[in-house]
Design a protein with these regions (language model features):
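Catalytic cores of large soluble enzymes that bind and process phosphate-bearing ligands
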Residues: 25, 112, 204
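Active-site phosphate-binding/coordination module
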Residues: 1-71, 248
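Short glycine-enriched loop/turn motifs at secondary-structure junctions
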Residues: 14-17, 104-107, 135-136, 181, ...
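Short, polar loop motifs at secondary-structure junctions
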Residues: 10, 115-119, 190-194
Length: 248
């Protein structure tokens, strides 16, 4: 079986022992994004080969707790939450620009900036050579213009010899929309956004209710027996599953 990770919205793809594809942001772009974030008191994290480093606020927001909170807040509260959020981040001491400049000595594949949806246009106008996508309404994922998760998967296809039509992908956020629309089977998670569900081939259960396992079972790829038990005819799949159960 194939064993790889497509990270940073398709900008850094690796196996357990080698990098298959990497597309770093220009140093000048990263530097100017840091300056912009510092000027506007916006927390920022830089995506390197060792992980997303920089902002503690962003680390909290990308944690399971942060994702849970963002999904249980009613949409009708969006404006109120946005105002409160802007007020909150103004109270934080700006990050050290020197620390961020030290981090950017390494290749940076993605920048994550604390910014509401309403601020997207201003950032895009300031930085026309980047693409902004989102997995949260409170942070912006910034990668090179013209790039995406789908293009990252296409690069994998060139390496391993498969077509996008042969791919099944799962998603729950805005930054998954192009990917789910472009692969053979796009599966929207039950906890995902409505627009994603409208475009998906199939809508499964939530991530907390074995949504991925249920979708794989729906398409006959595994045998989903109970909420906590499923197997596959692929021995490699079963070994990976057993390993994750052990680690959990």
């Amino acid at each position: 079986g194939l064993d790889f990770a497509v990270t940073y919205n398709g900008q850094y793809i690796l196996t357990h022992d080698k990098v298959l594809y990497q597309n770093q942001l220009p140093k000048s772009t990263v530097y100017n994004l840091i300056r912009y974030a510092t000027k506007h008191r916006r927390e920022i994290s830089l995506g390197t080969s060792t992980g997303l480093v920089g902002s503690n606020i962003i680390s909290m927001g990308t944690s399971k707790f942060g994702q849970m909170v963002s999904r249980i807040v009613p949409k009708s509260w969006a404006k109120m939450v946005e105002r409160s959020f802007k007020s909150l981040i103004r109270r934080f001491k700006p990050q050290s620009m020197e620390t961020l400049k030290t981090i950017m000595r390494e290749p940076v594949y993605q920048v994550v900036m604390v910014a509401t949806v309403g601020e997207t246009q201003a950032i895009e106008e300031k930085f026309p050579h980047v693409k902004i996508t989102r997995s949260s309404p409170y942070s912006a994922d910034i990668i090179s213009a013209g790039q995406s998760k789908l293009k990252g998967i296409a690069h994998l296809g060139e390496v391993f010899g498969f077509e996008l039509s042969e791919v099944m992908a799962f998603g729950d956020s805005e930054n998954d929309l192009e990917m789910l629309s472009g692969v053979g089977i796009g599966v929207a998670m039950g906890n995902g956004e409505d627009e994603l569900k409208d475009q998906a081939t199939h809508v499964t259960d939530t991530n907390n209710q074995n949504g991925i396992a249920k979708a794989l079972s729906h398409y006959g790829l595994i045998h989903f027996e109970t909420e906590n038990s499923f197997t596959s005819d692929d021995d490699n799949f079963n070994k990976v599953k057993d390993f994750h159960h052990l680690m959990d």
